[in-house]
């Protein structure tokens, strides 16, 4: 936030909320409120709380739903993307991506962040 304030271009320079990165630097979900009106994009990934890892949601300790709820509460309604590193089992990359997608979709639906999709 200090960087955004120092740059002083609120219409041009916005924040990318990378949830696992916020968690790794001990940012609490409630602190996201300070970014209201200044979020441009959101990255969803999980981690072990110690090392950056970009795991599918649910494989780590990041309180993803709490962060997404806080981001939702700022009024943000833009893009939420899934950020993954390489699967530890490359032959299962399709399953890895599907797991991340399904877990993220379930969280977004549960929080009412978007209309539920028909299946």
Spans of model-derived segments:
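Histidine-acidic metal/acid-base catalytic patches
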Residues: 1-119
